[in-house]
């Protein structure tokens, strides 16, 4: 029997690889919000996928914010006592390096050597410059092919949220209170919360999933 963790990890990776291929670079000098129309392509896709998972109120508002609610699956009296938890990520990517036509590469079973990126022989991720690579020997590592950025900031967070929602929907034995989902545009240009309606979002506590090592957290 396949382990549930393996299934969840497989779903997470599949989502991440799809999302990074969607161009969502934000722009510093734009007078629109979101700053680039391409961000709405991923926003609409995420809202549709959330609806398909049963989150009926999933929507993209006029500013490009994706929000949705995963209702509690606790008895009503218990659900009323627990806090509403928010999960937040941003869908735009950094404008300083091209994020169009991203070709992700999965390096299976990393062996500990420098990582050569196949799209550009001059692009090598060297262990001497990135000693943290040694913490991931034996794991799969995902990079771009070297011709673009990857977009893990923050499509890794987006994929984590979507995979977590899917897991909770498909595993009702995992009990939880109300969960609010918020995915924002334009974080990379400093405007991720510019039109974010905190009161409407309605979370008692919210956690941004954006960067960091496994298990790392900040207040």
Model-derived features: positions:
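Acidic/His- and Gly-rich active-site-bordering loop/insert found
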Residues: 3-141
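Acidic/histidine-rich catalytic neighborhood of metal-dependent amide-processing enzymes
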Residues: 133-219
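Short charge-dense sequence patches
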Residues: 1-4, 16-18, 108-116, 180-182, ...
């Amino acid at each position: 029997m396949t382990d549930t963790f393996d299934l969840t990890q497989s779903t997470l990776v599949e989502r991440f690889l799809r999302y990074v291929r969607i161009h969502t670079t934000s722009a510093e000098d734009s007078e629109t919000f979101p700053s680039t129309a391409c961000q709405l392509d991923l926003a609409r896709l995420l809202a549709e996928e959330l609806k398909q998972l049963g989150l009926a109120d999933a929507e993209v508002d006029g500013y490009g914010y994706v929000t949705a609610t995963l209702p509690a699956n606790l008895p009503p009296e218990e659900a009323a006592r627990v806090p509403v938890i928010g999960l937040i990520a941003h869908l735009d990517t950094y404008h300083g390096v091209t994020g169009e036509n991203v070709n992700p590469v999965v390096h299976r079973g990393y062996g500990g050597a420098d990582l050569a990126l196949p799209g550009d022989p001059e692009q090598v991720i060297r262990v001497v410059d990135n000693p943290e690579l040694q913490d991931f020997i034996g794991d799969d590592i995902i990079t771009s092919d070297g011709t673009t950025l990857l977009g893990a900031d923050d499509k890794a967070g987006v994929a984590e949220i979507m995979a977590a929602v899917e897991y909770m929907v498909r595993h009702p034995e995992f009990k939880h209170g109300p969960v609010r989902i918020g995915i924002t545009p334009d974080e990379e240009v400093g405007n991720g919360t510019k039109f974010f309606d905190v009161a409407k979002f309605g979370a008692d506590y919210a956690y941004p999933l954006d960067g960091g090592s496994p298990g790392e957290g900040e207040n």
